Amino acid sequence: MLTHEQIRAAKLVDNCLKDKIILVTGAGDGIGRTVSLFYARYGATVLLLGRTQSKLETLYDEIEALGYATPAILPMDFAKATFAQMNELSLLIQKEFGYLDGIVHNAGILGALTPLEMYDPITFEEVMKVNFTAPFMLTQALFGLLMKAKSASVIFTSSSVGAKPRAFWGAYALSKQGLEGMSDIFTQETQNHTTLRFNTINPGATRTNMRAHAFPGEDPNSLKTPEEIITPYIYLMTDDASGVKGQVIDCQPK
């Protein structure tokens, strides 16, 4: 089994994602945006899913201008999305591409940083829907397309508060704990009779808008950029990582 350090230091060859069809959620901002750009750079056709059409269009234009494979724009707000809409999305991808090589579940919201005894139930429900329930529904809706690929890879995005719950992080921490458990269960249910692989990535402290909102007094220049922690996201989508299953991988040494 590869160590986290080996995965972080993996050598990536040009076009290592050539001809792969990969869906990235939360593609309009932060880590999702960077992941999408790098996947395109390494040869993938990227399906850009996010809630803000204008941000997806800007990213689409950027990928096109760089001469990479033409991406697709898939607007969807996880806070409002239904399972029926996700099934419609699956049919659309089936018609256009026929299969799906991977999903990066990156979309997420922070919610409130407050004691659970004071946590607004409506906010709690929204955070759990966006961060936990929607990734489950989307994975289930796209499962058949993943099975049609040679060796599909699903990546969930966790957090340090997913591995170790922390006071005041409420629904966000609980949703990330849930994702790590979901990845583990999917792995146990598929690893012996399919080529599917499920893993979770903990990006660590990264220079994003969400991080700035959670830690407003923190110097952003003290943090790694998404570009600096990108290697595990790319490696786990390559065929070389076909044996990596059920892992929670830290992008930054602890």
Roles of regions detected by a PLM:
Residues L2, I7, L196, T200-I201, ...:
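C-terminal helical subdomain
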Residues I21, G26-G30:
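Conserved glycine-rich cofactor-binding loop
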Residues A44-T58:
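Conserved glycine-rich Rossmann-like NAD(P)H-binding loop of the short-chain dehydrogenase/reductase
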